[in-house]
Amino acid sequence: TIINVKCTSPKQCLLPCKQIYGPHAGAKCMNGKCHCSKI
């Protein structure tokens, strides 16, 4: 899932992804935006 959070590293995406998917969320930074996944 692409979320509307700008990023330069996956660490910046981890908290917003965890808010959506819970503690086991996966976070990636692609093309300057966060991508979250449920693990």
From Swiss-Prot:
Q: Where in the cell is it found?
A: Secreted
Q: Which residues form a coiled coil?
A: none
Recorded hits in InterPro entries, A to Z, give:
Scorpion_toxin-like_sf, Scorpion_toxinS_K_inh
Q: Name one GO cellular component term.
A: extracellular region
Keywords (alphabetical) are: Amidation, Disulfide bond, Ion channel impairing toxin, Neurotoxin, Potassium channel impairing toxin, Secreted, Toxin, Voltage-gated potassium channel impairing toxin
Annotated Gene Ontology MF terms? ion channel inhibitor activity; potassium channel regulator activity; toxin activity
> Where are the Isoleucine amide residues found in this chain?
I39
Q: Where is this site: Basic residue of the functional dyad?
A: K28
Q: In which tissues is it expressed?
A: Expressed by the venom gland.
Q: Tell me the PROSITE patterns matching this sequence.
A: SCORP_SHORT_TOXIN
- Cystine links in this protein are C7-C29, C13-C34, C17-C36
Family, per the entry? Belongs to the short scorpion toxin superfamily. Potassium channel inhibitor family. Alpha-KTx 02 subfamily.
Q: What's the further remark here?
A: Negative results: does not block voltage-gated potassium channel Kv1.3/KCNA3, intermediate conductance calcium-activated potassium channel KCa3.1/KCNN4 or the Shaker IR (with inactivation domain removed).
**Comment text on domains:** Has the structural arrangement of an alpha-helix connected to a beta-sheet by disulfide bonds (CSalpha/beta).
Question: What this chain does, per the record?
Answer: Blocks human voltage-gated potassium channels Kv1.1/KCNA1 (IC(50)=4.8 nM) and Kv1.2/KCNA2 (IC(50)=2.9 nM).
The protein here is known as Potassium channel toxin alpha-KTx 2.17
The species this protein was found in: Centruroides tecomanus (Scorpion)
